[in-house]
């Protein structure tokens, strides 16, 4: 039986992860290892300045106290889940992870850590906070497809699901990441002692929403599947940079 490590960034008790785990447990061996609280936008942060503790809930779920999503997958794969899991599934996130969101997302980061540790990995997000059952069934369907036809590309699958009933889903689309306009909102408040408090504002509005993007697919009622990879090298820029370096070295004056 496939052994799945399930994590997220919304916290171990979040509706998304609990709905997902309930659906997956009907077919697979599932172990939740997730933050004990909301750690949204934690990205790939790893805790190295203090020790971490675990809490095991009555149902067997494991919460990592003050841990990040990356901490949870690191500990789960390397120590807590035995035998070692076959795959990491992160989600269901409460809200989308489209376009530039993947840079900040703790949901995507948990999947990235799984892939970095050598496992297949899926991140699942719902474009809203209502139809978690839809996203759970979509995840089960994708896992079934992966078992029938294993994917050898070695990528992370970033899945975004429209927040609609399952019967209204039009199908799947393979997409690229779109983009948002840069977020510039900062909200300020003053505490009782007169100190200024700062709140980071919401993400920017959609920018690149071309027909092959994740934004376009979800807006049209399709499940978006975007392949992501751990290697951040900009390969197309390598030759350009080599030429630049050669010219810069020739023309340098000091």
Swiss-Prot record:
Cofactor binding: number and manner: Binds 1 divalent metal cation per subunit.
Cofactor(s) for this UniProt protein: a divalent metal cation
Main function: Nucleotidase with a broad substrate specificity as it can dephosphorylate various ribo- and deoxyribonucleoside 5'-monophosphates and ribonucleoside 3'-monophosphates with highest affinity to 3'-AMP. Also hydrolyzes polyphosphate (exopolyphosphatase activity) with the preference for short-chain-length substrates (P20-25). Might be involved in the regulation of dNTP and NTP pools, and in the turnover of 3'-mononucleotides produced by numerous intracellular RNases (T1, T2, and F) during the degradation of various RNAs.
Protein's name according to its UniProt entry: 5'/3'-nucleotidase SurE
Record flagged with keyword Transmembrane helix: no
Lineage: superkingdom: Bacteria
Gene designation: surE
Major site of localization recorded for this protein: cytoplasm
